[in-house]
Amino acid sequence: MKKILIIILTLLLCTGCFDYKEINDLAIINAIGVDYENDEYVITLEILNDQIDKDSSKITSYTKVGHGKNLTSAIENAADKLSKQLIFNHIKLMILSKSVVENKFDNIIDLFLRNTYFRENFYFISSTDTRPEDLLNHTTNESPIASTAIIDTLESISYSSNTNILKMFDEIIEEVITYGIDTCFSNITLKDDEFIIDGMSIFNNYNYKGNLNSEYVKIYKLLTDNFDRPSYTINYDNLSFTVAINNGKLNTEINNGSINVNGNLMGRILDNDP
């Protein structure tokens, strides 16, 4: 009996995981930027440092860039520059360049639908004026991780001015593959060293149709019944009014080739300039 107990205790206390990895051996990918230049994909991986910065006591990040004729080879090229195993299931953000949304959007959707290494609940945005690589390398002492600063900007604007389209990748997928529904998502740029949400990129199926500015974003959110107290400035007869919409609903229908919008919106005047 004693021998059996000794064997059981030995098995319990001495077992381990055969595929165990030290954290220092892993490269945790926090964000991905995708560009297309000179007939090649350019992948920028934002990687979290495995050690806290001694001076600031903050977690920082760095980037690695890979090139390839397809997305997989570009990612592998970036991975070859690291002596670590890439971990993609912590991704929080993906940024697409103008050339990608214009010509390679369907390839992006296809890759991430097929690849089980990537999770689908990360924010998905475009950057039609600034390269994704430049965005993910824009860090400061206050914001040592660029993707975190971008996400903070996305979320804060969503709850304040209502001028962005905050969507996860799985939402984009659902819209793209659903007949009769076209997708859209926020566009970002870098201006005066600040991340600025610059309207939204819109699509017809997989085809990029262009960008709409922030005022159109507010209208889109009203039409889709997805608004939270947006404000509008109305200029009339040399007067200026700022009106906030509290609640209500708009209905849209197509009749004889014409789009009709009707409904009721309740709001209040926040400010006026006589």
Give the role of each language-model region.
Residues 2-6, 13-274:
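Membrane-proximal alpha-helical signals and transmembrane carboxylates
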